[in-house]
Amino acid sequence: MFTNQDFEIFNDQTLAGRMHLIKTVIDPKFEQVAPTIITSLQTPGEPPFYAHVAKHLRRFKNPPVDTWVAFSQNKRSYKAWPHFELGLWPDRLFIYFDILDECKPAVQAKMQLADLTPLLKALPAGYVISNNHGVPATQLATPANITQAIKKFNQYKHSELVVGRAVLVGDPLFENADTLNKLIIATFKQLLSIYQPVMAAVSAERQA
């Protein structure tokens, strides 16, 4: 499972070097944990989830600033669908549910994101929220921050919704693989309550 040493891949400032470390150190861990996560997300009678390990194919000069595996009910892609992500920034491991820019129009066509407010506010302490998946910074998912994040999502064209948990480098959880794995699974299961109505809305829009 993930350890504090995994974050050392970001010390390599070259594209080739960091990509090699991602492929040989991090990606095998994503592939190892993916089946367990997929099983935890699966709902009887619903389409299966698929794991999408980031390939960083558009990187030609600068090394990736983060890396991840996404979980989507679309076999070919994930960015245009509500999805989950498990990944690493240089300072944290993240466990998130995402509505990215590519998915936003379909969500807004069929639902009011404010309808998710009660579900978001019911999240346990320690969850975080953001309007930009492309930066590591987040805010605690307090009622006030949730309200503000939903407002930004609705007001600004390229504003996204990211919510979940983050485990910072140096956290004792990285010394206990079993406990960390349980936290990852528990977080994704908790986020399912938010994912499901959003996915239903997007599916309805795509089938219209």
UniProtKB/Swiss-Prot annotation:
Q: Which InterPro entries match?
A: UPF0637 (IPR009403), UPF0637_domain_sf (IPR053707)
The protein's superkingdom reads Bacteria
Q: Which Gene3D superfamilies match?
A: Protein of unknown function DUF1054
Pfam families this protein is in? DUF1054 (PF06335)
Protein family membership: Belongs to the UPF0637 family.
User: What protein does this entry describe?
Assistant: UPF0637 protein lp_2332
